[in-house]
Amino acid sequence: MGMRSAARMPKLTRRSRILIMIALGVIVLLLAGPRLIDAYVDWLWFGELGYRSVFTTMLATRIVVCLVAGVVVGGIVFGGLALAYRTRPVFVPDADNDPVARYRAVVLARLRLVGIGIPAAIGLLAGIVAQSYWARIQLFLHGGDFGVRDPQFGRDLGFYAFELPFYRLMLSYMLVSVFLAFVANLVAHYIFGGIRLSGRTGALSRSARVQLVSLVGVLVLLKAVAYWLDRYELLSHTRGGKPFTGAGYTDINAVLPAKLILMAIALICAAAVFSAIALRDLRIPAIGLVLLLLSSLIVGAGWPLIVEQISVKPNAAQKESEYISRSITATRQAYGLTSDVVTYRNYSGDSPATAQQVAADRATTSNIRLLDPTIVSPAFTQFQQGKNFYYFPDQLSIDRYLDRNGNLRDYVVAARELNPDRLIDNQRDWINRHTVYTHGNGFIASPANTVRGIANDPNQNGGYPEFLVNVVGANGTVVSDGPAPLDQPRIYFGPVISNTSADYAIVGRNGDDREYDYETNIDTKRYTYTGSGGVPLGGWLARSVFAAKFAERNFLFSNVIGSNSKILFNRDPAQRVEAVAPWLTTDSAVYPAIVNKRLVWIVDGYTTLDNYPYSELTSLSSATADSNEVAFNRLVPDKKVSYIRNSVKATVDAYDGTVTLYQQDEKDPVLKAWMQVFPGTVKPKSDIAPELAEHLRYPEDLFKVQRMLLAKYHVNDPVTFFSTSDFWDVPLDPNPTASSYQPPYYIVAKNIAKDDNSASYQLISAMNRFKRDYLAAYISASSDPATYGNLTVLTIPGQVNGPKLANNAITTDPAVSQDLGVIGRDNQNRIRWGNLLTLPVAQGGLLYVEPVYASPGASDAASSYPRLIRVAMMYNDKVGYGPTVRDALTGLFGPGAGATATGIAPTEAAVPPSPAANPPPPASGPQPPPVTAAPPVPVGAVTLSPAKVAALQEIQAAIGAARDAQKKGDFAAYGSALQRLDEAITKFNDAG
């Protein structure tokens, strides 16, 4: 019976081929065009910043890795196809209706497309995936030694940090490549007749057998290599149910030998597989593969399970003791918690204190922080916003400066940035948004330890921050009334101004000044940017490229762009640092500071690893998620680390966007490796100017990770560690509106690191006992240049109330609750509790301080900004409460205790502070109402009605009662007296 010829593929006409080529060209252009534009823009941007070498190094590495991986993987797959084709049978009998014959005809008709196209496509995909691992490859090429060896194999930790990840990557690619080559070879032999299936039987040509068996043998050999590398990865492995990270008793005594046994079995199986080439018997490799599978189940899984259940669990604490000690040592090393960094001291926490002892603790009592940076932002907006398009973030920052008397003080600080999203009406058109409203103006600082005036009621004047302002004044000169002199308060770069989808500004001289700057009583003053930052935009090529990038035709047609124009974009400080140092993880908190008369944003950068042997693997998002991060939706990306260093301090100039990287950790091997990859990008630590060092602070995210780990790894004894009985807990935020951990707080207080009474800027946190609300420890991280980075842990052995119990005691105190009930007026006014600070005072005592704010009405409107109305304290179960720190300290410790506390700043003629030099008033919202005052007593021959006389007597009686209650510290009576006074004044005004 004759064979039917296979159907031929229809040929395309010339017109069809042209249309297909055009369509493919359009697709390629759509896919590659935006990437080419982005690459060119990045080349310009990195060059403008002075970091073009970073861009070219990354680009070259990615291209080389993509090409090498693509050629290797594609070449291996091509080899599998080519061998199958070259060794195909000369004659393949075709049966009727054989589907393989049709496929064979299709492949033969498009042999070059199939033979080259499939490997090329696979190679391209492999290259695209591989180029994303450019950092791992660069670390392998430039990584060095740690100078520390692992306790099991004696290898330097640089092997685990830099080499092992690279070997794993290469092994994974080889396994995938050989497997794909096996599949390609198998399919090709089937199509070309090297493998024929007929019913329940089949035929296999010699070339097909040799090639397929060889590829399987290579796969088994690669599996043997994988077993060898698995041994090292055990040291960063976490077995379920263990309170520590790393290889435990079962891993070392069962899993580790099992890996060696499996490796030996894999080598034997590989030999058995290769033997099929000569013996022509596929049963031998089949038996070998089954043996390998059974061995992995029995030796690799079954035996360790038996050891765990029979040997380890009955005596787990003793069996795991050695390995717990390894984990304690490694975790402390990996997270910077070694004995040269962390100092432990016993601290009673409940020692009695006299008024004289408290007053002598001047560094603490004079700096008790009253302003909560998460609460006072509406007050900044009310008094310092000036225009609708200026904006302050919801959470402000804390920094320290020397006051006019040379004393160290902490300040709530904020940059008055431009928020493009708050532009209204015609301000939103393209020219105004991108060429007129281009920058913010001003640096605002408020002493954190005081407010202006006393507000006994949220409707009274007082209780608002004292504002120190650096701003462009009405005559165009800089008004420097802030905590430090500032030459240039204009802000072109910042986290607020960049918080839009198109955050670019077009600046530069092109005719008259165009940018909005400030207003006088007569007109609006304009400005032209003169900084060095910005990508030139004068040429038509640049205009075309940016028109395509931002999909905006005005780049091409607008006459506001001239030969001197520049474009400022990518204006977020943290993102600029991450771009020029892509190997860094940045802290979630970026803060402004005045350094050498320049306003800069300070960014903390971390180097991290996720495979440090025996070190605990920590989720950054979980460890850093305190109540502030949750409330302001500022959670860091989920990233797991087992090693972290605050290796880099970066500054971003708020005016011209200059990024400067400084080496902070001179011993970090990871940073040293990256400094070899990108030489010259990170300046040595010695280049940090003293003026900058005075504003560097211990980073929040690192501290939160460390306190989470100190909760476990302060324990030295492995048996105690295993029992978890001596662990600590990070306390929950006691504020009833919070739902996560209590955040750490920056404060100025007495020097815990030096154990003296000098003022020190530090980051502090209380720690609870494990699953209890009593204090276990107090952690302080020094930010002073001389002791920067030192952690001091005060361990508290007694039963001292933790933050939750302290907050409960304060809020349920009868005097406090009655007074705030009167102020709240049945929820007509909103009461808010500020941050609960824990402060060591006197000789072994702990003072809790919690400011109380109130705002008129129940809304969060800026016009209803919160005022400080009370200060609550607790010491040794006793509550102190009053309008000022001095009153609260006196109530706790007696007369004289508040002698060194900072007093309340006077109000300026009972008028709230005016907004910064001559900007227009806030767009909306009334000014705070004046304090309610008693009507003057009539004098002379004025006859009052009996009703007015009676009301006046009630007024005088209420004033006298209020004074007596204030002297006695009876704030429940004081609140009642204020209410009587309001009622009496109303009666007086209504009386005829």
Swiss-Prot record:
<dbReference type="InterPro" id="IPR005372">
    <property type="entry name" value="UPF0182"/>
</dbReference>
<feature type="compositionally biased region" description="Pro residues">
    <location>
        <begin position="912"/>
        <end position="938"/>
    </location>
</feature>
<feature type="transmembrane region" description="Helical">
    <location>
        <begin position="255"/>
        <end position="277"/>
    </location>
</feature>
<dbReference type="GO" id="GO:0005886">
    <property type="term" value="C:plasma membrane"/>
</dbReference>
<protein>
    <recommendedName>
        <fullName>UPF0182 protein Mb3215c</fullName>
    </recommendedName>
</protein>
<keyword id="KW-0812">Transmembrane</keyword>
<feature type="transmembrane region" description="Helical">
    <location>
        <begin position="284"/>
        <end position="306"/>
    </location>
</feature>
<dbReference type="GO" id="GO:0005576">
    <property type="term" value="C:extracellular region"/>
</dbReference>
<feature type="transmembrane region" description="Helical">
    <location>
        <begin position="113"/>
        <end position="135"/>
    </location>
</feature>
<keyword id="KW-1003">Cell membrane</keyword>
<keyword id="KW-0472">Membrane</keyword>
<feature type="transmembrane region" description="Helical">
    <location>
        <begin position="17"/>
        <end position="39"/>
    </location>
</feature>
<keyword id="KW-1133">Transmembrane helix</keyword>
<comment type="similarity">
    <text>Belongs to the UPF0182 family.</text>
</comment>
<feature type="transmembrane region" description="Helical">
    <location>
        <begin position="59"/>
        <end position="81"/>
    </location>
</feature>
<feature type="transmembrane region" description="Helical">
    <location>
        <begin position="212"/>
        <end position="229"/>
    </location>
</feature>
<dbReference type="Pfam" id="PF03699">
    <property type="entry name" value="UPF0182"/>
</dbReference>
<feature type="transmembrane region" description="Helical">
    <location>
        <begin position="169"/>
        <end position="191"/>
    </location>
</feature>
<feature type="region of interest" description="Disordered">
    <location>
        <begin position="906"/>
        <end position="938"/>
    </location>
</feature>
